[in-house]
Structure formats: structure tokens, C-alpha cells
From Swiss-Prot:
This is Aspartyl/glutamyl-tRNA(Asn/Gln) amidotransferase subunit B. The keyword DNA damage does not apply. Disulfide bonds: none annotated. Pfam families: GatB_N, GatB_Yqey. Its EC number is 6.3.5.-. Heterotrimer of A, B and C subunits. GO terms for biological process: glutaminyl-tRNAGln biosynthesis via transamidation; translation. HAMAP family: GatB (MF_00121). Keywords: ATP-binding, Ligase, Nucleotide-binding, Protein biosynthesis. The keyword Phosphoprotein does not apply. The lineage of its organism: Bacteria, Pseudomonadati, Chlamydiota, Chlamydiia, Chlamydiales.
């Protein structure tokens, strides 16, 4: 990257739209379910029929409160709804019901690790609103599916507290993990359950000025978010450098863009609307939402352990490496799998490696998640215990892991009973004979070892393990080999 670019920094804030996993929609009894036939989960309310009146979904309110508790936000005892007016085919009422002036949540923060450092990303607010329908294009015409119209959302608005793409991705990743842990959304980004609108501007480093921002709409991939932020950063910096004498306010107009992953560039959709353009006014068909501290406290008591707290506990209780702990807590189901396995295996570091590396790699190849593969936590724990006790070698353990993937209902113990030929070598005289043969076949390695080249020892061990098909106990191989070499 040009040194000139290094003199600039991004200023980034995110608006995250999260579909709540309620049974019904926000203001009607229509089902909230993804993937059904178009226009089957609809009602007069979500299709904007004359005379239909909204009724607020209590479950959606509870989930918004739970989110507030998870991020240490302030829950408003009094909040209200407003109409946001705009015309678009996927909005049959020509307005959205949202919370413009009095949101249910203010403040709070999300904790994340960025480049090895703990960061607190501050939130401005979170508010409840309903989703729009979906336009579906078919060649020369388009149809509208209103199944999504009226689905409850919380829109989580961060402060402009991120200054590079790494910050934004770390925040977004931590936020999605937190949402998944507290169970208020299925967090399926491919299905649009979580969508990111990214606001970004740039400024010279050291400046406190907030210049005109650009919004990049509807991102549902962390990788695309990082690419879009970097591309937009470069575009804006170049525009300012090409127009040094212009008022910065006129160089980058406020606008809405989308990310084109094929062209690797942001594409203009429209110039930015002002708040007045939406003609906000109080929703007349809904009363003020009133809550009590006791009601909020009851919901707060249902909070599970949050991902960052779990991460810290894994470092403290299990003495795991930071990167391994981060991988484990990134998926609550994998974290639960690991914790169940720790009840039967106390070699936590080895166990975490088998969960996050060995089995995770095998599962990825097959498009599976270990937590739903059918393999039991007790099976992985038993495998690690067998290695520690010398019942099997690491090489045999990997072969057993392959067989567990094929037959997830079988434990390592069962697999060994069915395949006794997999058991390690127990005939030490045979092992000594093989070691002697390897030494005789590799005289140069023996000379190298005796002249201080330690890599030669590793080569000889590798040859022995190869000859024994990985069945020789590694500790005994080393012990016997050293004795034979010293003769």
C-alpha cells in the first residue's frame, strides 16, 4: 500500500439488523419461519390491509431486553414506536414501524480481541422494528414475497469507534457470537438473519474531524466486509488527494453503496436521504411501551455465560492457548462439546487440540460440525486418554479418528476391539530388531547424529515409525534408539 494511504485512517460504525427467532411476527400472529412457500406466512397486518391493527409481540420485547443485559446497555422503562415513511414494493404499508426517537436500548458495549488486544466497542443504541418483504427477480419481471414482511428485528447501532477493517470484523464477529450464545437469533447470515450496514469515512491521522460517511448496505459476510471497507477507504482517500483545494464536505457526498464482490469495488446505489425525508412521526396504533425494573431483572437472570467470559475462563481454568480458546468459544455448540469432554479427560490442552484441529479438520472436509456429527464428547475424551496412557500411539489415534468419522456411534474402545491389529507393538525384541535394521540402513544419519546434528535423530525415528506403521510407542523408540546409537 502507498505510504500516502498510511497517513489516513478510517472511521467506521456498524448498523446490524438482527432477525429475532420469535414464533410469530412483530405485530401479528403470522408465523416467523424462513424457507416456506412465498406469501404463505402473511396476515392483514404485515401486508398492510386497511383497518388492520398491530399488536406488539412480547417475546420480541423480551429478546431485545436480554440483548441489552448482555451488552450492559440501559433498558428504557418508557419507549415508543414511530413510522418511517418510504415507498418501495417490498413495504406494502409504505412505512416501517421502528423506534426513531425513543429506542428500547441505549449504550452498552461489545468486548472483542483485536490483534491480540482486548477492545471494548461502544454501542449507541438498539431498537425494535419490523422487516420488509423480499423482491425476487425472474428474468423480465419481479415478484414480492411478504413472508419476511413484519419479521421482528433489532437494529444494533454502534458508535463510530472502529478505525480499520480488522476492528469492524472483530466487532461484527464478537457480536454475532454473543447473539448466538444468548439465543435471540439463529444468526444464519446466508439466510439474512444478520445483515450489516457499514458506515465509513476517512480522515488524516491525528484529526478528530468526522467527514461525510458512506453506507455500504446489506453485507452478510465478514470477508466481504473487510474487502469492501478497504476498497472504500482507498476510493475516498484518492478522492481527497485528487481534490486538495475543495471543501471536504463536497468531495465525498453522503451516499449508499453496495459491494460488488466480482468487481471488487463499491457501487453507488443512491445519494443519502436525510431523516426529514422519511417523515417520521409517532405510531398512532401502538401505545407507549412501559417496563419495570423488576421485569428487566427477571430477564437478566436468564443470561447464559457470554462468549468473552467463557474465553477468559478457558484461559484461566484450562490453561489453553489464546488462539485455541478463541476457536472453541466461537461456536457455542463446539464449546459445549469440549466442556462435556473435559468431564472425562483432564489433559485439556491435548483435548482442545483434538477438538479444534484433528476432528475439526475431518469435519470440515465432510461439511460437518463436530457437535452434530454423532461423535460423542466421551469418545474424543477416551481417545486422548488412550494416548496419554500409552494404550495407542498418536498415529493410531488418527486412524481411529478416521474410523470414528465413518462410524460415529463407535467409541475408540469398540474400534480397537473390532480391529485388534491396530494395537501398538508390545514385542520389544521385534522393536529392537527393527531399530537395529534402520541404524544399519542409514549410516550417514548415524554419523550426522554423533557429530551433533540433532535433526538426524528425528529422521531415524521417522524411519522406525514408518517401518512399524506408527504402532511403535514413541517414548520407547527414543529410549531404545539412543541406547543403540551410544553403543
Amino acid at each position: 500500500m502507498s505510504d500516502v494511504y498510511a497517513d489516513w485512517e478510517s472511521v467506521i460504525g456498524l448498523e446490524v439488523h438482527v432477525e429475532l427467532n420469535t414464533k410469530s411476527k412483530l405485530f401479528s400472529s403470522a408465523q416467523n419461519r424462513f424457507g416456506d412457500e412465498p406469501n404463505t406466512n402473511i396476515s392483514p397486518v404485515c401486508t398492510g390491509m386497511p383497518g388492520s391493527l398491530p399488536v406488539l409481540n412480547k417475546e420480541a420485547v423480551n429478546k431485545a431486553i436480554l440483548f441489552a443485559c448482555a451488552v450492559q446497555g440501559e433498558v428504557a422503562l418508557l419507549s415508543r414506536f414511530d413510522r418511517k415513511s418510504y415507498f418501495y414494493p417490498d413495504s406494502p404499508r409504505n412505512f416501517q414501524i421502528t423506534q426513531f426517537e425513543h429506542p428500547i436500548v441505549r449504550g452498552g458495549y461489545v468486548k472483542a480481541i483485536v490483534r491480540g488486544e482486548e477492545r471494548y466497542f461502544e454501542l449507541a443504541q438498539a431498537h425494535i422494528e419490523d422487516d420488509a418483504g423480499m423482491l425476487k427477480h425472474f428474468g423480465e419481471f419481479a415478484g414480492v414475497d411478504y413472508n419476511r414482511a413484519g419479521v421482528p428485528l433489532i437494529e444494533i447501532v454502534s458508535k463510530p469507534c472502529m478505525f480499520c477493517a480488522d476492528d469492524a470484523v472483530a466487532y461484527a464477529t464478537a457480536l454475532v457470537s454473543l447473539l448466538d450464545y444468548i439465543g435471540i437469533s439463529d444468526c444464519n447470515m446466508e439466510e439474512g438473519s444478520v445483515r450489516f450496514d457499514v458506515n465509513v469515512s476517512v480522515r488524516p491521522k491525528g484529526s478528530e474531524e468526522l467527514r461525510n460517511k458512506v453506507e455500504i448496505k446489506n453485507m452478510n459476510s465478514f470477508a466481504f466486509m473487510a474487502q469492501a471497507l478497504e476498497a472504500e477507504r482507498c476510493r475516498q482517500i484518492e478522492a481527497y488527494l485528487e481534490n486538495p483545494n475543495k471543501d471536504p464536505k463536497t468531495v465525498i457526498p453522503g451516499a449508499t453503496y453496495r459491494w460488488d464482490p466480482e468487481k471488487k469495488k463499491t457501487v453507488l446505489m443512491r445519494l443519502k436521504e436525510r431523516a426529514e425525508d422519511y417523515k417520521y412521526f409517532i405510531e398512532p396504533d401502538l401505545p407507549v411501551l412501559q417496563l419495570t425494573e423488576a421485569y428487566i431483572d427477571d430477564i437478566r437472570k436468564t443470561l447464559p455465560e457470554l462468549p468473552y467470559d467463557k474465553y477468559q475462563r478457558y484461559l484461566r481454568e484450562y490453561a489453553l492457548a489464546e488462539d485455541i480458546a478463541a476457536i472453541l468459544i466461537s461456536d457455542k455448540h463446539i464449546a459445549n462439546f469440549f466442556e462435556l469432554a473435559t468431564k472425562e479427560c483432564k489433559n485439556y490442552r491435548a483435548l482442545s487440540n483434538w477438538v479444534t484441529v484433528e476432528f475439526a479438520g475431518r469435519c470440515k472436509t465432510q461439511g460437518k460440525n463436530l457437535a452434530f456429527s454423532g461423535i460423542l464428547p466421551s469418545g474424543v475424551a477416551q481417545l486422548v486418554n488412550f494416548i496419554d496412557k500409552g494404550v495407542i500411539t498418536g498415529k493410531i489415534a488418527k486412524d481411529i479418528a478416521d474410523m470414528m468419522m465413518e462410524s460415529p456411534d463407535k467409541s475408540p474402545e469398540v474400534i480397537l476391539k473390532e480391529n485388534p491389529e491396530m494395537l501398538p507393538m508390545t514385542d520389544e525384541s521385534a522393536l529392537v530388531a527393527i531399530i537395529s535394521e534402520v541404524i544399519s540402513a542409514n549410516p550417514q544419519s548415524v554419523v550426522d547424529y554423533k557429530s551433533g546434528k540433532t535433526k538426524a535423530l528425528g529422521f531415524l525415528v521417522g524411519q522406525i515409525m514408518k517401518r512399524t506403521q506408527g504402532k511403535a510407542p514413541p517414548n520407547r523408540v527414543n529410549e531404545i534408539l539412543l541406547v543403540e546409537l551410544d553403543k
